């Protein structure tokens, strides 16, 4: 687990969600619902929100932007085996009118979705190259957790970056350009996310496991 960071209101820490193809959606649902539960069933409603937004704006979400035709993407994202990423986070940020900040433990950077919209609140996720988890603020006695923070609270953001830096120094990340995957449908061995995406486009296979 990543380093915990103390804050005036408690301790910022990482909560682990299931390592499945929907960890992004589970993590977003978790932080938007005040850390009340890890609800792995919530991912389908979030996937539908994204599909609807994409279908309603085919000019922005064209084939060049999505990497596949708009209609195909809308079918693809509703499949529970499909991973989410930057496109999906940007749509969810806009839909819920909240800044979604993602700490990347491989690069050490922070990606701030919705930053230019000047939303009043933010939520925090951490990403290791493959898996997303939520960051939460636990009270000192562990009785309460907070997952939504004012965007004016730079201290929370700084501590989230510290957690990411600690994870990076401990090499708690997956190098997606070089890790080995197996297609769980045809058993083909693939190196890196690029080969996996090319294989999926060519074959329609979308179920991969890390070796």
Task: Label every PLM stretch briefly.
Residues 1, 134-137, 208:
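Generic detector of short, aliphatic-rich beta-strand segments that form the cores of beta-sheets
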Residues 2-10, 15-114:
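Papain-like cysteine protease catalytic cores
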Residues 13, 179-181:
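Short structural boundary motif marking the start of a folded domain
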Residues 76, 118-119, 209:
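Alpha-helix boundary/capping detector
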Residues 86-178, 187-195:
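Deubiquitinase catalytic domains
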Residues 175-179, 192-211:
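C-terminal recognition-helix end and immediately following basic linker
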Residues 184:
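Cys/His/Pro-rich metal-binding microdomains
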């Amino acid at each position: 687990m990543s380093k915990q960071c103390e804050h005036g209101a408690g301790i910022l820490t990482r909560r682990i969600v299931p390592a499945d193809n929907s960890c992004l959606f589970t993590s977003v649902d978790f932080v938007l619902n005040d850390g009340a539960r890890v609800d792995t069933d919530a991912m389908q409603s979030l996937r539908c929100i994204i599909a609807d937004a994409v279908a309603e704006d085919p000019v922005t979400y064209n084939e060049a932007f999505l990497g596949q035709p708009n209609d195909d993407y809308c079918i693809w994202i509703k499949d529970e085996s499909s991973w989410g990423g930057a496109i999906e986070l940007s749509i969810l940020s806009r839909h819920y009118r909240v800044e979604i900040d993602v700490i990347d433990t491989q690069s050490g950077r922070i990606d701030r979705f919705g930053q230019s919209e000047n939303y009043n609140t933010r939520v925090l996720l951490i990403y290791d190259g493959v898996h997303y988890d939520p960051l939460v603020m636990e009270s000192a006695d562990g009785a309460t957790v907070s997952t939504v923070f004012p965007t004016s609270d730079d201290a929370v953001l700084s501590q989230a970056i510290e957690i990411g830096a600690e994870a990076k120094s401990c090499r708690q990340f997956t190098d997606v350009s070089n890790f080995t995957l197996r297609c769980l449908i045809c058993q083909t061995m693939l190196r890196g996310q690029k080969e996996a995406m090319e294989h999926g486009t060519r074959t329609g296979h979308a179920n991969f496991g890390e070796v």
